């Protein structure tokens, strides 16, 4: 008997959609190319003692009554899957030469802190922060208006969204006349987008910046527990996930997708899976290439013409015999830059592959929870994240493996040098474990084209009302992916839940 929903891929949006449908007594089958579920949200084990999440660090939308919380409540998971909040008085600590700023959820306090740093620009700072707050409120109104929007019935505040539809963050910084240093402090969480201010959609920045202002969180029992809990809902409701199954083709009869051809990565055999509905969690462009773009409508073909987001460089580390609290670490992230010009810094790292003065994020999740520690007792996880060019690393790996390894070591050493100079003297003496991941690592383990981290690039061109959504123009097939919804933890939860609402008529967010 065919399942009601055959889902291709087990990324976070697919698991949310699958869990909601399974809970609604629909038969759900998921085929996954990897050996673990979760996509970028999966947790990997290295050796006997170390566990790291591939890409997730801190998340938003998890507070009482917020979107993730409402979805978990609908699944009866809100008491099982809980979250610890980062310090609301300063969940992101921004560091640059001569300045530091603790980002707070209180906009008035944020205005005060910035004004103390830049007293001559108090008026401009206030106007900018209040405008960000207003646009955030407009997004809430826009979302509450539902799926079928009537622009003439939207609250007046929501119409303010359209003013900045084509703007980058840099455009709006310039409109409000913020000093360069203030711009850098406010945009220093750029690794959350892997874009600098002069390319990043202002709307994308507002959604994430204010999302974290409303509460930055880390799962009490780590991200692995979140993924496993969603899987458990699916399996307890007669659903299943079949691993090591790579989708290689879609069978289309006229305008209807009837089945998916997969390659079993264990035995090398091809199999055919069918379902009453096909949910495509894999990259939409990749799926369209398999189907044949000529079979899709002109409108969908146009929406599929997106660039991928940049990729990243990750260093997963553990330290011992040190109290990180004494060195300024705690229930917050640290974002560092050695230059006040993030646009130029990004260009230098991403296009010139020069990491001599990098900007990067430092995450210490161990301060948020002591539950089921993922490292040996007495050690602390510390992770470093920055941007990296997929084409550059792919070419290095294919042509000169030693040069590829040397470049990864060079980037890590550059970041550690900065950590020792600015934050933790003798950091290397306390380093108990380290492993790095490059864009090709992302591609190999998460099956993401060009090692992309967020699906389509988060520029104004892609963050607009013409953005790709669940529609494929084919019968019985729907997209459910970061590129057809939104990226990140809260974004993919939202994407899966929105598709569930569309197909079930059961509104939960």
Name each model feature, range by range:
Residues 2-134:
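N-terminal glycine-rich phosphate/pyrophosphate-binding loop and immediately adjacent elements
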Residues 56, 480-504:
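A conserved FAD-binding loop/helix module that cradles the flavin
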Residues 63, 158-168, 211-232, 244, ...:
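Short beta-strand to alpha-helix junction loop
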Residues 97-200:
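Rossmann-like flavin
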Residues 183-193, 357-363, 421-486:
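A glycine-rich dinucleotide-binding beta-alpha-beta segment and adjacent secondary-structure elements
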Residues 206-269:
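Helical element adjacent to the flavin cofactor pocket in flavoenzyme catalytic cores
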Residues 248-376:
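Mid-domain catalytic core of redox enzymes
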Residues 322-437:
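C-terminal segments that line or cap access tunnels to active or ligand-binding sites in enzymes
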């Amino acid at each position: 008997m065919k399942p009601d929903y055959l889902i291709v891929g087990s990324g976070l949006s697919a698991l949310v959609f699958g869990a909601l449908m399974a809970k609604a007594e629909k038969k759900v089958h998921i085929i996954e190319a990897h050996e673990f579920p979760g996509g970028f949200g999966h947790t990997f084990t290295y050796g006997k003692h170390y566990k790291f999440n591939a890409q997730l660090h801190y998340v938003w939308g998890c507070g009482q009554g917020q979107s993730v919380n409402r979805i978990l409540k609908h699944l009866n998971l809100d008491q099982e899957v809980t979250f610890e909040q980062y310090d609301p008085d300063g969940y992101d600590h921004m560091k640059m030469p001569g300045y530091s700023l603790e980002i707070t959820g209180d906009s008035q306090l944020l205005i005060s802190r910035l004004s103390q740093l830049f007293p001559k620009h108090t008026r401009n700072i206030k106007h900018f922060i209040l405008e960000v707050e207003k646009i955030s409120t407009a997004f809430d109104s826009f979302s509450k208006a539902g799926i079928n929007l009537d622009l003439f019935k939207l609250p007046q505040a929501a119409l303010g969204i359209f003013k900045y539809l084509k703007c980058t963050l840099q455009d709006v910084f310039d409109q409000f006349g913020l000093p360069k240093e203030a711009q850098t402090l406010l945009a220093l969480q750029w690794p959350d987008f892997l874009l600098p201010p002069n390319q990043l959609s202002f709307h994308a920045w507002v959604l994430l910046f204010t999302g974290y202002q409303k509460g930055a969180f880390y799962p009490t029992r780590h991200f692995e527990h979140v993924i496993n809990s969603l899987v458990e809902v699916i399996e307890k409701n007669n659903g299943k996930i079949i691993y090591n199954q790579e989708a290689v083709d879609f069978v289309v009869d006229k305008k209807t997708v009837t089945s998916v051809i997969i390659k079993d990565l264990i035995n090398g055999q091809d199999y055919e899976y069918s379902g009453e509905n096909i949910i495509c969690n894999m990259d939409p462009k990749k799926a369209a290439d398999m189907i044949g773009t000529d079979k899709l409508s002109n409108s969908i073909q146009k929406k599929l013409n997106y660039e991928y987001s940049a990729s990243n460089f990750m260093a997963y580390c553990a330290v011992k015999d040190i109290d990180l609290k004494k060195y300024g670490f705690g229930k917050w992230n640290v974002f560092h830059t050695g230059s006040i010009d993030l646009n130029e810094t990004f260009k230098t790292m991403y296009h010139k592959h020069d990491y001599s003065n990098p900007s990067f994020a430092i995450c210490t999740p161990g301060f948020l929870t002591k539950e089921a520690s993922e490292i040996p007792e007495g050690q602390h996880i510390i992770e470093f994240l920055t941007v990296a060019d997929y084409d550059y690393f792919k070419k290095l790996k294919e042509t000169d493996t030693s040069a590829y390894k040397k470049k990864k070591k060079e980037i890590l050493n550059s970041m550690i040098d900065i950590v020792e100079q600015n934050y933790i003297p003798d950091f290397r003496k306390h380093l108990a474990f380290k492993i790095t991941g490059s864009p090709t690592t992302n591609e190999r383990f998460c099956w993401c084209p060009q090692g992309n981290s967020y699906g389509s690039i988060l520029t104004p061109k892609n963050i607009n009302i013409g953005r790709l959504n669940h529609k494929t123009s084919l019968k019985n097939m729907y997209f459910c992916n970061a590129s057809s919804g939104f990226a990140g933890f809260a974004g993919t939860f939202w994407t899966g839940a929105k598709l569930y609402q569309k197909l079930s008529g059961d509104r939960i967010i």
